[in-house]
Structures are given as C-alpha cells and as structure tokens.
C-alpha cells in the first residue's frame, strides 16, 4: 500500500487503537492480542493502530514492539490496514518506522519525541528524517511537546511527499481551522483528543471528520453507532450518547492520571475480552472505579 492509498483510507471512517495484551506477569500475550484483533476487525474500523498510545507504546521494549506489529499485521492481513505507532528520539523513531515497514504495516503514526522541548526547526528536521527513512505513509501526531505550527506544516508537506496525515490532540480550534483551510486536502486530518467522541462534532465542522475511538476497544457496536450518527448528522443519537454515556465516562477517566488507558483495559475486561494489567507507571482502576465503569457499560446492552 503506497502513501496515497493510506491517505485515502484514513480520510473516511472510524479509526481505533487496540490495547496491547499482557499476561499477569506483565509480558506481551501474543495469542490474546491476536484474538482481540480478530474480534475487533469485523466491526468496520477503517484502520487499526498497533502499538499506539492506548496500546502502551511507551512501555514496549524493542523486541516486543516488533512482535506486536507482526502479530497485528499477520492477524489482520486482508481485513483491515494496520498503522504502527513509532516515536521517541529521532533515531529510535526511524528504527521503528523501518521495522514496521519491513513487517508489512501500512504506515506509521509518528508519536511525540521524549521529554525535551524542541524548536520548530528541530521538529521539522525530526519529521523529515523519519519520513525520508521509509516509503509508506506517515501521520504526524500533534500533541504534548511535539506541536507544529502552520508554517512548519506547510514546509513539511513540500519536503515530504509521504507525510499524508495530521492527527491533532491539541484542541486548539483556531489553529486547526488555519491548518485545514490553508493546507486543504494535501493531508488527511484526524481528531485525537481523549474520548474523541465528545469533540467529534466541532472537529467535523473544521473539515476533520475522522477520529480515533478508544472505546471501540470494549463497545465497538456503540462506537460505530456514534460514528454513523455523526456522519449522517443524527444529533439526537450523538447527543443522547454523549449525555448518557460519554460524559459519565469522562468523570471516571478523570479520577486519576493515566486512567485514559487503564479505563480502556478495564472496559475490555468487563465485556469479556480481558487484556491483562497495564504496565507501570500506569495503574489499574480501583475496585470502586471498576464497578462504576461496569455499571455504565451495562446501560448500553450487548455489544
């Protein structure tokens, strides 16, 4: 799959980041992860991101990274495209991008570099080097210490033909408006804020109709129902789900730092697709929070 084909795929539909399965010792559980992907693939996501943020990319060793990507590619071959997370220091991101391409992934999501702040010139060089190291498509993840301004994005679209996507987690509506209006369809735009469904309507109005759904990990039927309602401007359905499910979900998520990932794994366990514990420095939900989440999920009915 070339970069343009990937761009077309991520320009429409719902995207999701499967959690990464660990056993009770905290080791990668390949068979459980493969079963998870087999369960999720038929629900209709346009692409799945292996080893993304929700997949605890930040905690994987080099060997585990390769095993996660290979398992995802092999399991989903012919059914749904796999986009790999890649990031950290520039040379590490290049190594991971090359490895993902070698293993048959269809592109990468370029995750933020680690810890240090960087100038726009430094970020441009970082993205350029990663893009130049591979042939397949690269999606830039605009978040945390890794945020590009409009001028930098323009320069990179001219330098890097295989830079095909821009995922925004900044929530800066004015900036996203400027980007979509100036860059146009040179890039595909993805909403990337936590619990993205709550922000999906305003992002759609900006020309960013696609987003990644974390809750697809445990309520794929409802996640697709929400996306299809959003797509058809069925505000009655989207408003009902936001009020009755997503806003209460956010209240649980915000009880502790790191719950944005821990809560997703807990949800998967509640619906019968246990992915094991999260790895430190994340912590699993408390029993009380787990029970509150289970009660909320139960209101949606079978998935």
From Swiss-Prot:
Pathway: Carbohydrate acid metabolism; D-glucarate degradation; 2,5-dioxopentanoate from D-glucarate: step 2/2
Reactions catalysed according to its record: 5-dehydro-4-deoxy-D-glucarate + H(+) = 2,5-dioxopentanoate + CO2 + H2O
UniProt xrefs under SMART domains: DHDPS (SM01130)
Keyword annotations of the record: Lyase
A GO biological-process term: D-glucarate catabolic process
EC number: 4.2.1.41
Record lineage: Bacteria, Pseudomonadati, Pseudomonadota, Gammaproteobacteria, Moraxellales
GO molecular function, one term: 5-dehydro-4-deoxyglucarate dehydratase activity
Family: Belongs to the DapA family.
Gene3D superfamilies (UniProt xref): Aldolase class I (3.20.20.70)
UniProt xrefs under InterPro entries: Aldolase_TIM, DapA-like, Dehydro-deoxyglucarate_dehyd
Protein name: Probable 5-dehydro-4-deoxyglucarate dehydratase
Enzyme type, top EC level: lyase
């Amino acid at each position: 799959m070339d970069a343009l084909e990937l761009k077309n795929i991520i320009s429409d539909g719902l995207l999701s980041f499967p959690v990464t399965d660990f056993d009770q010792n905290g080791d990668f559980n390949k068979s459980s992860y493969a079963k998870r992907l087999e369960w999720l693939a038929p629900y209709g996501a346009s692409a799945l991101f292996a080893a993304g943020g929700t997949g605890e990319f930040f905690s994987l060793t080099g060997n585990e990274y390769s095993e996660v990507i290979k398992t995802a590619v092999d399991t989903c071959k012919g059914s749904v495209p796999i986009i790999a997370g890649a990031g950290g220091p520039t040379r590490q991101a290049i190594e991971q991008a090359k490895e993902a391409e070698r293993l048959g992934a269809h592109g990468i999501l370029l995750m933020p570099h680690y810890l240090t702040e960087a100038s726009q010139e430094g970020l441009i060089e970082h993205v350029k080097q990663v893009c130049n190291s591979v042939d397949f498509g690269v999606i830039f993840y605009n978040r945390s210490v890794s945020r590009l301004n409009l001028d930098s994005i323009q320069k990179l679209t001219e330098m890097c033909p295989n830079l095909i996507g821009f995922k925004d987690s900044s929530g800066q509506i004015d900036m996203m408006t400027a980007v979509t209006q100036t860059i146009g369809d040179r890039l595909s735009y993805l909403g990337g804020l936590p619990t993205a469904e709550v922000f999906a309507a305003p992002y759609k109005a900006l020309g960013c109709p696609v987003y990644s759904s974390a809750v697809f990990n445990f309520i794929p039927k409802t996640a697709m129902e929400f996306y299809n309602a959003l797509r058809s401007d069925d505000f009655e359905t989207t408003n009902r789900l936001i009020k009755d499910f997503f806003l209460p979900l956010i209240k649980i998520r915000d009880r502790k730092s790191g719950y944005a990932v821990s809560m997703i794994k807990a949800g998967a366990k509640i619906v019968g697709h246990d992915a094991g514990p999260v790895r430190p420095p994340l912590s699993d939900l408390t029993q009380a929070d787990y029970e509150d989440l289970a009660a909320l999920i139960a209101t949606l009915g079978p998935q």
